[in-house]
Design a protein with these regions (language model features):
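Gram-negative outer-membrane beta-barrel transporters
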Residues: 522-524, 528-542, 550-659, 681-682, ...
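Transmembrane beta-barrel wall of Gram-negative outer-membrane proteins
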Residues: 113, 120-151, 157-226, 249, ...
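Acidic/polar loop-and-plug regions of large Gram-negative outer-membrane beta-barrel proteins
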Residues: 174, 183-258, 283-319, 373-387, ...
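Face-selective signature of the C-terminal outer-membrane beta-barrel domain
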Residues: 252-281, 308-442, 465-483, 518-528, ...
């Protein structure tokens, strides 16, 4: 499931200074689901895809899809800073309401510096992160770095020695201008990223929101994927069966070249210029879990040697992505302030260009419901329902936009902030998505089918976003504040890969928050009412259905997986309190408490399956899946001498599994903790723990249950889903010189 935009984020304290909008309390790098990706923070709308990441003033990836940002980015010693960019900034910088990671590459300074981090964990993961920089004279300098990661995973897979193998190589040359007027740098990075996505497992859904292990299967420790080391698929481009080695089918290779310029102009104005060229290719074999069915002697399932199989069958959908991106993004920004210091303004202009495409093939497989399962053949074949879903596009996208903002300290009591952004978007290229009936996806679909007709597309739109904030001080350290922002977007290039033609309706998000703030030497708190809505949300969810008769190359009783585009609205009303307490020297406690009611609106769909069965569903008024109505974060930290002790605990209340809200998971905790020790100015050590409570974290929505309305048959029901990272201890040594 992929959403048009990730309109995400909880709330931040309002701040008068732009740099203070980048709040360090969000801990986006502590992710319970993945060790290599930043986490996403929900504002009350569904979260899909991956977190947005900026580096050196521009996005790491043109899209938050295909060549995902985290596949060419790592937060480590090659960055001089990594922080959180708030929705206040993102609504102007990117045109959406979301959090983002914002990072700056480390350039050479006025002396030689070196940094090395070495980490390992209890499951065999090892990583080395190193960077050296040195001046060359006359303001010039160079910096070189590399990040290497070897991760077999906690559930060691037989199909590959490593679940993740990361190779990043980075180098830069920079120039510091005389009299401290600024700095310029040219940065190159090559990324080679191997990643197997496999955090699935079977479990028993008890029926009261709890789960228990199935037949001793250890979530997070046992492998739940066949050991086959090859991917066999029907190539959507050629119409022929193709084979790839499993590691090759899950590797991204990316080149990035960044230029940065920061320069102080006369009169206190600052100029910042950023430009980036990126070219890369992504092979990605993405497996998702579908339902578990029961196979009888006549079901047609067998092992590779022809032995008939009876018993539980795990169905999976595989997507094989063959995608590329070649993009160029540039911007120039001026910042300054008025003579009396009451106004702080910013103006920026951007031009982004992208040439991208994908050939995405799909098929279904089946395997045993067991640890280290064996692949099952259906009617003598290892896969079925080839390309009943498929993507293809090859095109270009241009974005030209500009924005301006101003912070106005009207008086000692009144502060105002406002900004507006206008964007011109043009999308053009080739796809197979017009009204020609032959372009409709079906089992056996490929672009060489005589009935398929590639069509040209060329669409242009204007997108707008704006924000307004106000803060009124009633007395010292206490006052009222409010903010309203809005962002409108349209379909981008990657939405043209499927059938039918993507919607050209604008997708608009509106966000309001308002309440009180209280600040003194021991507390910094905001408590606000929040409301966010999204109109014309676009999604391509997958729905499961047990066939009532033989159809689509499958037999009656087998489960079919149908993917269809849908459009609907969403809305969430909530209340959030966010506070940082400093009751004693060295002690800091961050607490955030959220109560909200996330709901679907105007959400109706009518899927028709291969056996002719049509179902009608109306999810309007239902709670959005995988979002909790109550969230709590508690993050204490205590420093004394060379020691630092910290803890991060997040509670998520009940989350619904399906859009009908008939099934749900009980609340869960995500817990992290650690001890840091600074031996001297050059050496320090850390011991960190993930999932201290060792919760299984069966979470998210389960596709095979999306249309279930009666929960009665699903007590002690065997299903499969995702899990969070198991209890993990990691040790790190940091050396600087």
């Amino acid at each position: 499931m992929r959403r048009l935009t990730t309109l995400a984020a909880a709330l931040l304290c309002l701040s008068a200074a732009a740099q203070q909008q980048q709040n360090s309390n969000r801990n986006m790098l502590l992710n319970a689901a993945s060790a290599s990706q930043p986490r996403q923070i929900s504002l009350g709308l569904p979260i899909a895809g991956n977190a947005y990441i900026f580096e050196d003033g521009l996005p790491v990836s043109y899209y938050n899809y295909q060549l995902y940002p985290y596949k060419s980015w790592h937060s480590g010693v090659s960055h001089e800073s990594t922080q959180t960019m708030s929705p206040q900034d993102m609504v102007l910088k990117y045109g959406i309401i979301s959090y983002s990671v914002d990072s700056r590459s480390r350039l050479a300074g006025d002396r030689f510096e070196g940094r090395i981090n070495y980490s390992f964990n209890m499951y065999g993961k090892q990583s080395v992160d190193a960077n050296i920089s040195t001046p060359l004279g006359s303001g010039w300098g160079v910096s070189l770095g590399s990040y290497q990661n070897f991760d077999p995973g906690s559930n060691h897979l037989d199909m590959s020695y490593l679940q993740e193998r990361v190779q990043f190589y980075k180098g830069s040359i920079s120039k510091v201008f005389a009299e401290g007027r600024g700095k310029a740098g040219l940065i190159y990075q090559y990324s080679n990223y191997l990643n197997h996505i496999e955090n699935f497992g079977p479990f028993v859904f008890v029926g009261d929101g709890s789960v228990r292990e199935l037949d001793g299967f250890r979530l997070g420790h046992d492998s739940y994927r066949p050991a086959d080391r090859y991917v066999d698929y029907l190539d959507v481009a050629t119409g022929k069966m193709a084979r790839m080695q499993i590691d090759d089918a899950n590797t991204d290779k990316i080149h990035n070249v960044n230029f940065v310029l920061d320069y102080d102009l006369p009169g206190g104005t600052h100029l910042a210029v950023h430009s980036k060229y990126k070219t890369g290719h992504s092979f990605r074999n993405n497996p998702t879990i579908s339902g578990i069915t029961q196979a009888g002697p006549e079901s047609g399932f067998s092992y590779a040697d022809g032995t008939v199989y009876t018993g539980r069958v795990q169905n999976r959908r595989y997507l094989h992505f063959n995608a590329f991106e070649e993009s160029w993004m540039s911007n120039a920004a001026l910042t300054g302030q008025s003579g009396d210091g009451r106004h702080r303004w910013r103006a920026e202009a951007d031009w982004w260009r992208n040439h991208a495409g994908t050939e995405t093939s799909m098929w279904l497989i089946a395997h045993e419901v067991a640890a280290d399962p064996k692949l099952l053949y259906l009617n003598g074949k290892p896969g079925f329902s080839y390309n009943s879903y498929a993507e293809f596009y090859n095109g270009r996208e241009d974005k030209v936009f500009a924005f301006a903002s101003d912070e106005w300290n009207v008086s000692d009591r009144l502060w105002l902030y406002g900004g507006a952004r206008v964007e011109y978007l043009n999308v053009r290229g080739k796809a197979a998505n017009d009204t020609n009936p032959g372009n409709a996806r079906h089992a056996g679909f490929s672009l060489v089918d005589p009935s398929v007709q590639l069509n040209d597309f060329n669409d242009s739109h204007f997108n707008y976003s704006y924000i307004g904030s106000v803060r009124l001080t009633l007395f010292s350290g206490f006052g009222l504040q409010a903010e309203y922002s809005s962002a409108t977007i349209h379909s981008q290039l990657f939405h043209y890969g499927v059938y039918p033609y993507p919607s050209q309706k604008p997708i608009t998000a509106n966000y309001f928050r308002g309440g009180i703030y209280w600040r003194n030497r021991w507390i910094d708190m905001t408590s606000q009412i929040t409301y966010i809505e999204q109109k014309n949300a676009q999604e391509r969810p997958s729905f499961s259905h047990v066939l009532t008769r033989d159809a689509g190359g499958m037999k009656a009783g087998q489960e079919e997986n149908l993917t269809m585009p849908t459009y609907y609205d969403l809305g969430t009303l909530g209340w959030l309190t966010d506070a940082v307490l400093t009751p004693a020297e060295g002690l800091s406690i961050h607490v955030m408490f959220t109560v909200r009611n996330p709901q679907y609106r105007n959400f109706k769909l009518t899927p028709t399956f291969s056996d002719g069965v049509t179902e009608e569903h109306d999810f309007s008024g239902k709670t959005i899946t995988a979002l909790s109505k109550t969230e709590l974060e508690v993050e204490p930290s205590y420093s004394t001498g060379p020691w630092r002790f910290w803890l991060s605990a997040r509670y998520f209340s009940r989350q619904y599994i399906n859009k009908t809200n008939s099934l749900y998971f009980n609340g869960r905790w995500e817990t992290f903790g650690g001890i840091d020790y600074k031996l001297n100015d050059h050496v320090s050590f850390s011991a960190n723990v993930v999932n201290i409570l060792n919760q299984k974290g069966a979470s998210g929505s389960i596709t095979s249950a999306d249309l279930i309305t009666d929960p009665t048959p699903y007590k002690n029901y065997i299903m499969a889903g995702t899990f969070i990272r198991p209890f993990t201890v990691e040790l790190t040594t940091r050396i600087s010189f």
